[in-house]
């Protein structure tokens, strides 16, 4: 079987070329061809010796996930569905803004966690994505979006906030991050690459040590009672442990704050008392809040908080001198908004079946 070179960061490529008896600089050349020029085969790599190209064609490949579907929202948001084999597809979303272009990347086929308000979680879980399948999303988006009139890349920021829990696919995510940051890859700044987690504490510590990029934490609750219900991972890593991990992460983080993401669920976590509890919870963690109006999906069982409740919640946090943004809903007409990504998941957990049985029971 041929080796897919998209699975390697520069260190891995260098080892691979050493095993082939080639000099280390070949790794940098090939990496630039793949990620900066968008090369899909070795014959395009004209500065490589013909003998090396022949050897690479025999032993290696550049396998990028196939594009199944592309959609564009009325607000300019774009979504791609990529085929990752065996009936599975993952979604990637590009969000244009006046000062930046952000790509939201998936890390798993489905999600192993079961956050109750998330469409991806309802789809169940099939497998982790390979490093090639993760970086392949940026490859596709980069090819589709091109460059600005000033010859700058349209994609300036990457957030690991698509399908899946990135920390549960740690090694492959770190390899993909390494390619994103490498000057021979995409040359992104650590400050402009964000990994989001629901709170896998040991992996947060590992990421801090090996690849400290910006960190976002899917918080969504101000106390353990509520969070246990809507983010079941909290039963393993409760809020006290999570806050301590956030403090440790900041020691090496490229930004001097953690972003806490908080989906606003009507009657669940959006009362004034929850805002005051949040203030107490995060008092020792430099942070900013991103309030996310819930994006409905069929049979979710939740409603979006009213604009008034969101405003009151925001004002309480701001009065306590926190930076607070209320996320604009982008791409909801193509199901590309936060919490709506579902892709195509051949579920191995029977979670889809479980939710169907619950719904049948509710309708009966």
From Swiss-Prot:
Further details from the record: Reaction proceeds by a ping-pong mechanism involving intermediate methylation of a conserved cysteine residue.
Alphabetical list of SUPFAM superfamilies matching this protein: Radical SAM enzymes
Residue intervals of the Radical SAM core domain: 97-333
Entries under Gene3D superfamilies matching the protein: 1.10.150.530, Aldolase class I
The keyword Heme is assigned to this record: no
Compartments where located: Cytoplasm
PROSITE patterns recorded: RADICAL_SAM (PS51918)
Residue sites binding [4Fe-4S] cluster per the record: 111, 115, 118
Pfam families per record: Radical_SAM, RlmN_N
Protein name: Dual-specificity RNA methyltransferase RlmN
Cofactor: record remark: Binds 1 [4Fe-4S] cluster. The cluster is coordinated with 3 cysteines and an exchangeable S-adenosyl-L-methionine.
Protein species of origin: Neisseria gonorrhoeae (strain ATCC 700825 / FA 1090)
Classification of source organism: Bacteria, Pseudomonadati, Pseudomonadota, Betaproteobacteria, Neisseriales
Catalytic reaction equation(s): adenosine(2503) in 23S rRNA + 2 reduced [2Fe-2S]-[ferredoxin] + 2 S-adenosyl-L-methionine = 2-methyladenosine(2503) in 23S rRNA + 5'-deoxyadenosine + L-methionine + 2 oxidized [2Fe-2S]-[ferredoxin] + S-adenosyl-L-homocysteine; adenosine(37) in tRNA + 2 reduced [2Fe-2S]-[ferredoxin] + 2 S-adenosyl-L-methionine = 2-methyladenosine(37) in tRNA + 5'-deoxyadenosine + L-methionine + 2 oxidized [2Fe-2S]-[ferredoxin] + S-adenosyl-L-homocysteine
GO cellular component: cytoplasm
A GO BP annotation: tRNA methylation
InterPro entries, A to Z: Aldolase_TIM (IPR013785), Methyltransferase_A (IPR040072), RlmN_N (IPR048641), RNA_MTrfase_RlmN (IPR027492), rRNA_lsu_MTrfase_RlmN/Cfr (IPR004383), rSAM (IPR007197)
Keywords linked to the UniProt accession: 4Fe-4S, Cytoplasm, Disulfide bond, Iron, Iron-sulfur, Metal-binding, Methyltransferase, rRNA processing, S-adenosyl-L-methionine, Transferase, tRNA processing
Positions of disulphide bridges: 104-338
Function: Specifically methylates position 2 of adenine 2503 in 23S rRNA and position 2 of adenine 37 in tRNAs. m2A2503 modification seems to play a crucial role in the proofreading step occurring at the peptidyl transferase center and thus would serve to optimize ribosomal fidelity.
Transmembrane segments annotated in the record for this chain: none
